[in-house]
Amino acid sequence: MKTQFVILIVAIVILQLISQSEALWGALLGLGSTLLSKLGKRGVQNMDQFDDIFEPELSEADLRYLQDLLR
């Protein structure tokens, strides 16, 4: 009974490794390319990619629209 349980656990672990290996290799390759790109000058880039989305000032039209929306 113990042997069957051990075989079952080993089989489950092996199946999990097979099914997750694609994600593991993708993560490792992605991490490697990220590290390599950060080492060179070309890896330095502007990380403020969401500055165009956020606008701190609201115009009068925006305020009117929000007031109409919240009524």
Curated annotation (Swiss-Prot):
* Listed GO biological process terms: defense response to bacterium; defense response to fungus; killing of cells of another organism
As given in the record, the signal peptide range reads 1-23
Where is this protein found? Secreted; Target cell membrane
Propeptide residue interval(s): 40-71
Q: What GO cellular-component annotations does this UniProt entry give?
A: extracellular region; membrane; other organism cell membrane
Query: At which residues is Leucine amide found?
Result: 39
The principal location of this protein is secreted
| Tissue expression per record | Expressed by the venom gland.
Q: Which keywords accompany this UniProt record? A: Amidation, Antibiotic, Antimicrobial, Cleavage on pair of basic residues, Cytolysis, Fungicide, Membrane, Secreted, Signal, Target cell membrane, Target membrane
Q: Its domain of life?
A: Eukaryota
Q: Which family does it belong to?
A: Belongs to the non-disulfide-bridged peptide (NDBP) superfamily. Short antimicrobial peptide (group 4) family.
Role this protein plays: Antimicrobial peptide with potent activity against bacteria S.aureus (MIC=9.3 uM), weak activity against E.coli (MIC>100 uM), and weak activity against pathogenic yeasts C.albicans (MIC=100 uM) and C.glabrata (MIC=100 uM). Is not very effective against P.aeruginosa (MIC>300 uM). Also provokes high hemolysis on human erythrocytes (HC(50)=4.8 uM).
The molecule here is called: Antimicrobial peptide VpCT4
Q: What species was this sequence derived from? A: Mesomexovis punctatus
